[in-house]
């Protein structure tokens, strides 16, 4: 009789371990962003010597509703999400705290619209340079994850032909 209850207890422990392990693997997939947000057509505009501000552009495609809540880069002290819009014949630029992404809908950051502003550049950005970004997203389930990408500095003409 005792042997049966020991085996039954072992089954419960094993079931718990397997369930817990599966839950951790699902959380790890969300946490590292694998296949969660796809980033394509990314490029950074080159700057002139002495220029302290730059811009980056890319297209996001999220597998589920998510929000871009932060961006860091190795070439600048701060990165902000900005939007440009025409109001009463005047072009205005506004900082956005976050950028909502709708599942399955591409979201394009492009000149004249949404883009990433790179402030206090540490060095000029020359054509051919690589810029590292760490993008922080929050899923609809409130899971946060970072996605690291390397982006090439290109002229607008080059960027439009490499897509």
Regions found by a protein language model. Name each.
Residues 8, 16-18, 133:
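A general marker of short, structured functional hotspots
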